[in-house]
Amino acid sequence: MTTGADAATERQDKPGGKLFIRPWIFIRGVPAMKFLPPEGPPEVAFAGRSNVGKSSLINGLVGRKGLARTSNTPGRTQELNYFVPEGYSGEAGDLPPMALVDMPGYGFAKAPKAQVDAWTKLVFDYLRGRVTLKRVYLLIDARHGIKKIDEEVMDLLDSAAVSYQIVLTKADKIKSPAVTKLVAETGQKIVKRPAAFPEVIATSSEKGEGLEELRAAIVHAVTAG
């Protein structure tokens, strides 16, 4: 049987391993821009439609079930949730090597319109104005593909010159040949987008597929000049 320590050791030996070998913790939820942690360490953010599987993907990346709260209710994540390697507070003078940011889902939420509008403003302000944001991982449900609202978010990222990469989630829910075709089709859809990273990554949080590739991509994003 593989233990958590065994899995961590195995991750350490892979391209994305060293940043993910240490346990990760939640440090704060950010309901408004004024509550953001000090700028300094590089950040990568996870964006996508509500219920696309952001929290499950983050849990899979760091190998810790339940770190990012998952829910069957779309729109449950209402803040920018910050996660860092254990041993850092995220405060000035005790900054981590990097941070993962789980963003509120867009496109649907079981909440009053005013609240949804506030989340939307927070997300857009963060994407446009966070200097330490190195890359956004835009999550797309493999069963549904890119929707109009995803294209609107890509338009925003392109106009703000924020680097982003498409990550297909729940790839285990469709057949393998369909995944290969979807990766190719998605790559073609973003080829002319100026801020889009050309490589599309297919993942399954449930099966662990594509997670090591995504870890390596994150490490490259935060360490490349």
From Swiss-Prot:
Keyword annotations: Cell cycle, Cell division, GTP-binding, Magnesium, Metal-binding, Nucleotide-binding, Septation
GO cellular component terms listed in the entry, alphabetical order: cytosol
GO biological process, one term: division septum assembly
Cofactor entry: Mg(2+)
Repeat among keywords: no
Gene3D superfamilies: P-loop containing nucleotide triphosphate hydrolases (3.40.50.300)
Annotated residues for binding of Mg(2+): S55, T77
Annotated residues for binding of GTP: 48-55, 75-79, 102-105, 169-172, 203-205
A GO MF term: metal ion binding
Entries under InterPro entries matching the protein: G_ENGB_dom, GTP-bd, GTP-bd_ribosome_bio_YsxC, P-loop_NTPase
Source organism superkingdom: Bacteria
Domain EngB-type G: 40-224
Stated role: Necessary for normal cell division and for the maintenance of normal septation.
Family label: Belongs to the TRAFAC class TrmE-Era-EngA-EngB-Septin-like GTPase superfamily. EngB GTPase family.
Stated name of the protein: Probable GTP-binding protein EngB
Organism: Chelativorans sp. (strain BNC1)
Lineage start: Bacteria, Pseudomonadati, Pseudomonadota, Alphaproteobacteria, Hyphomicrobiales
